[in-house]
């Protein structure tokens, strides 16, 4: 049998002194303790602000040049990556291939724990090869403890292919050095339930992924102000949201907004451009394409040239 690596020194494996009596707390005391400990996630994000900003910048540049974004992880980390990737098409009307989540064990691991599969670095490397990752792409390796072999295998394979690499972990660099382009450390301390990184580590990872993907989409012109003008109108809730955006930004009535939305093919961004410029759908789409889908730049460019 292979000798097990000692991991007790890792921050995510250490014992939290504030929760030593966890099994003796009342429900209200449990809630209060979680609330106090979860405050560390905000501090962790603040401490990693520079690295997160750099990650947004290089990822937006890569996607702007035709690249793709991949999240790679196992267990909770993998599920969070898949979740964030899955939210991009409905929120920003992106192609499903643009942002992808890779989890050790594949789709089955999303609903049933397959933690034993994270110990195979060759599987991580294989996942990179299967998706034909190239130098235009960005790979984010997510591992709370920073040691997941599946993730390290994927990162090394991505580096060999020339892709930009980002690491996201919850342990100090001196405990687990990782050689990547951007190293994001989200230090939230020991978990309330020792070693259960689905707790603070999972929460702060979700926060960081929210910031990364949303920041990238902002840079790519997928929003106008703070509105998701590239929303995919696929159900009644999103249809209503689209109409309200048009009403708020144009002062049209709900009925008028509905007509405009239909004329645009239910594309909010195009509908706004049509309203503000007087262009039809075809001309409006051509103008948007000329400005790489950035609504604000397209409107300003049109006004400058008329």
From Swiss-Prot:
<comment type="pathway">
    <text>Amino-sugar metabolism; N-acetylmuramate degradation.</text>
</comment>
<comment type="function">
    <text>Specifically catalyzes the cleavage of the D-lactyl ether substituent of MurNAc 6-phosphate, producing GlcNAc 6-phosphate and D-lactate.</text>
</comment>
<dbReference type="Pfam" id="PF22645">
    <property type="entry name" value="GKRP_SIS_N"/>
</dbReference>
<dbReference type="InterPro" id="IPR005488">
    <property type="entry name" value="Etherase_MurQ"/>
</dbReference>
<feature type="domain" description="SIS">
    <location>
        <begin position="59"/>
        <end position="222"/>
    </location>
</feature>
<dbReference type="GO" id="GO:0046348">
    <property type="term" value="P:amino sugar catabolic process"/>
</dbReference>
<keyword id="KW-0119">Carbohydrate metabolism</keyword>
<dbReference type="InterPro" id="IPR040190">
    <property type="entry name" value="MURQ/GCKR"/>
</dbReference>
<dbReference type="Pfam" id="PF20741">
    <property type="entry name" value="GKRP-like_C"/>
</dbReference>
<feature type="active site">
    <location>
        <position position="118"/>
    </location>
</feature>
<protein>
    <recommendedName>
        <fullName>N-acetylmuramic acid 6-phosphate etherase</fullName>
        <ecNumber>4.2.1.126</ecNumber>
    </recommendedName>
</protein>
<comment type="similarity">
    <text>Belongs to the GCKR-like family. MurNAc-6-P etherase subfamily.</text>
</comment>
<dbReference type="GO" id="GO:0097367">
    <property type="term" value="F:carbohydrate derivative binding"/>
</dbReference>
<dbReference type="GO" id="GO:0097173">
    <property type="term" value="P:N-acetylmuramic acid catabolic process"/>
</dbReference>
<dbReference type="GO" id="GO:0009254">
    <property type="term" value="P:peptidoglycan turnover"/>
</dbReference>
<keyword id="KW-0456">Lyase</keyword>
<dbReference type="InterPro" id="IPR046348">
    <property type="entry name" value="SIS_dom_sf"/>
</dbReference>
<dbReference type="GO" id="GO:0016835">
    <property type="term" value="F:carbon-oxygen lyase activity"/>
</dbReference>
<dbReference type="InterPro" id="IPR005486">
    <property type="entry name" value="Glucokinase_regulatory_CS"/>
</dbReference>
<dbReference type="GO" id="GO:0016803">
    <property type="term" value="F:ether hydrolase activity"/>
</dbReference>
<dbReference type="InterPro" id="IPR001347">
    <property type="entry name" value="SIS_dom"/>
</dbReference>
<feature type="active site" description="Proton donor">
    <location>
        <position position="87"/>
    </location>
</feature>
<comment type="subunit">
    <text>Homodimer.</text>
</comment>
